[in-house]
A protein has these predicted regions:
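Active-site neighborhoods and metal-handling regions in enzymes and metal-associated proteins
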Residues: 1-125
Length: 125
């Protein structure tokens, strides 16, 4: 479900669409399964730093967000819990678990917005 939601999201990752079109597509795919869609961790822009603006939620948004333009590089990373959407950080400050200790899944790739279809930069052939 998590992997497929990524591919549903990037169908909307086209120049001229809006950032939250991606979020809404991811949410629309996951929600019927009844899983918790993690809200505390989101996708993000990629540039001179690993984590940059804009933030890309994996859950539905009422706003549209900024307009996607060719050359934008984005990390799209749906995160789904079998139980609650809530998460908590472990003492190491890096490890994140679901608050109810249910199983979780995360799928991530970096994409490039182009004039046509988005290019997946991190997917191996």
């Amino acid at each position: 479900v998590t992997k497929q939601s990524f591919f549903e999201g990037i169908k909307m990752a086209k120049a001229g669409n809006h950032l939250f079109d991606i979020s809404n597509a991811i949410d629309a795919y996951i929600r019927p399964y009844g899983y918790g869609i993690v809200r505390d961790l989101v996708g993000h822009g990629i540039g001179t730093h690993l984590h940059e603006e804009p933030e890309i939620p994996n859950f539905a948004q009422r706003r549209r967000g900024l307009r996607l333009q060719p050359g934008m590089t984005l990390a799209i990373e749906p995160m789904v819990n079998l139980g609650t959407a809530d998460v908590r950080w472990m003492k190491d400050g890096w490890t994140v678990i679901s608050a109810d200790h249910s199983l979780s899944a995360h799928y991530e790739n970096t994409i490039l917005i182009t004039e046509g279809e988005p290019e997946i930069l991190t997917l191996r052939a």
